[in-house]
Amino acid sequence: MQDPVSGFIYPEEWISLCTDETERLLVSQGLAVLTSDGTIRRRGFTTGSSASAAAKASVLSLTKTGFDEVSILTPAGIRVQIPVTIARGTGECRKYSGDYPGDVTAGLVFTAEATPADSGTTLVFGEGIGRWSRDTPRYKTGDPAVSCQAMDEIKNAIEEAVQETGIPGVSVRIFAREGRIVAEKTLNQMVGVVGGISVLGTTGFVEPWDDHLEQTVCDRAVHAERVVLTTGRIGMRYARMLFPDHEVILAGSRLGTIIPHLTGEVIICGLPALVLKYINPVILEGTGFSTVEEFMTNDRFLPAMQTSFQIYKSAHPNVRIVVVNREGAIIGDSQ
């Protein structure tokens, strides 16, 4: 059995310990993660998937009634059914966090309002959706804080609904009434997002991190002969290409708790932000930049990255660090 989200092939002994066929089905569909003792942890849905469901529901409700869930295609390529509530021209989706107890956006309601149009599709973001307070390498001041993957997911959901209803065009507005309040519990303001939450999600799923699952990840890493730890799905994809003979494991922000358990050679591979802030938490101090992504546009970045490599390697000589950009090119290698 393979996890369709991460690509991890579950060991037979783990599968044999999971005797509930319903739970096995959830795992095979990517809706849950199987742990080393045979129990499962359910994945939740990202803000991007939740907003997509609300948007699709709002468009469908222009011509349809009597439905309480919609089908959306996640960025991971997995189609899921997400519960919604509707009124004519309005769709709402309450964000489901799965078995991730630390999800501060759990339960947040996304609302979408759809208005028929003569042609084309218009998408706008309103109250509770954060906006960038300054220019960044990928966004301009005032742009909604919606990642590229989430934006594509939302637009695809709207287009599916337009095709299903047969209407010539539509205008959709997405908002989250409690978004500004919830955003106060996040790091948005530190990275330059104000007025609400970010709409994110590289896979469409929220990983069910807890102490139990962390131990399972440790078990996987300890038993692997050659291991690459990644910080996210993009890093995972490129790590598989760069290191095809290694076991690639999604560690997320748990690098610091997993690496001490490993005694052999280890590779950390991922995008700059999480990797560099893990190996050198103070890399941005004195730079005048708030994010690693912004720092990357400055001539001081590459020397700072090399210095960070040297400092970390002096304490962890068995760990190699490989930093890639969003196109998969290696921009830094401690080897």
Curated annotation (Swiss-Prot):
InterPro entries: CbiD (IPR002748), CbiD_sf (IPR036074)
Transport in keyword set: no
Annotated coiled-coil segments of the chain: none
UniProt pathway: Cofactor biosynthesis; adenosylcobalamin biosynthesis; cob(II)yrinate a,c-diamide from sirohydrochlorin (anaerobic route): step 6/10
Catalytic reactions on record: Co-precorrin-5B + S-adenosyl-L-methionine = Co-precorrin-6A + S-adenosyl-L-homocysteine
Recorded family membership: Belongs to the CbiD family.
Protein name (record): Cobalt-precorrin-5B C(1)-methyltransferase
Organism taxonomic ancestry: Archaea, Methanobacteriati, Methanobacteriota, Stenosarchaea group, Methanomicrobia
